[in-house]
Amino acid sequence: MADYITTNIRNIALIGHGSEGKTTLTEAMLYAAGLVDRQGRVEDGTTMTDFDPEETRRKCSISAATAPVDWNGKIINVVDVPGYFDFVGEMIGPLRVVETAVIVVDAVGGLSVGAEKAWDYAGAHGLGRMFIINQMDRDHADFDKISSQLRAKYGNCVVPILLPLGKGPTFRGVVNVLDRKAYEGAYKKSVEVPMPENMKGQLMECYSYLIEQAAAADEELMEKYFETGELTFEEIKAGFRKGMKDGSIVPVVAVSAATGVGIARMLDLMAKYFPSPAHNGLYWAGKDPRTGEDITRICKDDQPFSAFVYKTIADPFVGKLSLFRIFSGMLSGQTTLYNPGKDKTEKCGGIYILRGKKQVVKESLHAGDIGAMAKLQYTSTGDTLCDPANPVIYPPIEYPKPCISKAVYAAKQGEEDKVFSGLQRLMEEDPSVTLSKDPETMETLLSGQGEMHLDVIRSKLASKFGANCVLKDPKIPYRETIRKTVKVQGRHKKQTGGHGQFGDVWIEFSPVTDGSTDIVFEDAVVGGVVPRNFIPSVEKGLRECMVHGVLAGYPMVSVKAKLYDGSYHPVDSSEMAFKTAARIAYKKGCADANPVLLEPIMHVEVIVSDDYMGDVMGDMNKRRGRIIGMEQCEGGQKIIAEAPLSEMFKYATDLRSMTQAWGRFTMTFERYEEVPADVAKKVIASADKVVDDDE
């Protein structure tokens, strides 16, 4: 593989909605460049970037994969990113290491929620953008309609650059607005042809869009354009390059990844006009780990080395691969690597370029390039590697919070260590997955971005590490309390031949009404009817019992127990006897005090477009939720509601289905409320009640 200096590097991420042809587009680019003998198909499991067995089985991308494409003396580092929202974590990392986001849009369906979110993510990372209207060979493909939709949505920055010749089955070539030439044919067989008469009007209209935006990208060009109404071809190209870099020009191109039409001309645009890492200047901002001061690094070979690890591949057979982007300096096998976040020095175990799963050995890489290193001992995704003499640390990747959790158990008893060590390895690959221990239920929770996401983790655990796990809905941390005041005696008497056991207490159980969930104990004994040294045993017995309620074994809350009377035996009374008497009083008293079941109520905020308001609100009502209010917000309407946790476990998946993936939500604990009688009956019937033996 050739050696490419910084100015000849182009780093791009293919992003957008799922099933709109990003992986097929990557294959077409590789085939056009002569890097594969035949173009793979997602349906057949033969693509270079969908190499994971899970991707082959599911016929969709679930991990970001790189595919460097050599084209006209440039290297285009393509990062093929999954489009489904369950795998959004795989998009966040690559966007940190590219200059341009290429958003793929379907030529029939048009702008999708995945494309809109991709636009927002790219903008948040300050990237240049381009739209590819793919699948122009399909029936009902309509470039004019989709490009007009994009201009209406995002403004005049959107400029059609490659116009289609024909559409649907007759799509045979493209018109390049920039050089005002027409081309027919697929892949490298794309050749110049005379400009069709019926395209000249559309060409000049789009050319005028291009001139205006090229002029707007540069103040000097704008002044000349206002004065003369013209720009030279070289000036237009310069304005186009600058507009691509700062986002003031967003080209739109027509291609068919399946047939290869438009692919070569699209690659020409990327090679000629996409920004290289050198164009970003003082772009990479970090901090000095020793002082906390801000540091910038210029993406040049003569700068101190620094790199950012954006992805990790954990393989049980070949070990760990760390995928990185060089932000400054050069990397060779002799480069000393320092991880400032871990304060560790790493030994480079080999430098590679990855094309799918294929590893190409490299002696060195230039500033701005993307590569991989093997067997880094301490380094994880989001870490910085740098020159130890010139340390810098870049901001870590901020992954979206998990929106679904499942309790995870080993499928076979005794394999717990195998399961959880495997999950830890998979979390190195995918930091958007988390493991946590619920202190209430003591379950281990596996959390991620959706049901498919967690199912993929479960499948990978089995295929990669031979560990099988079971995923279940988490237990609900119900509570129990009482609604009325009762007075009850707890009397424990047992004669066994020697010293007996005797304890006698009268306790008043009442609800706590000040909003506190505490268990309150009050000593109201007078006259020594219960000796002072036994009163702590009564309190201890009550508190131990109240860990398990009388209805379904859930902890009691908001209960006051007042010890106000009792009796004792000078010989047979003991701490244990009074502790047992307190337990008897608790069971008798709370059972008669109108015990009720409480459930956690969550504060939920859902953001949706106006089109889906009715469906979302109706669904919330079906979940026993209450709509508290609505607010106008960026991106649509915010619905504020409260709903029981038990009804919200699959809400992330259901909301995506209801809103065509437009909706998003946040959820936090609010308070406990009484469970409706019909629901409580089912919970109590299915609960594993704790059986206490008073003996």
Q: Which positions does each model-derived feature cover?
A:
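Structural and coupling elements of P-loop NTPases
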Residues: 1-695
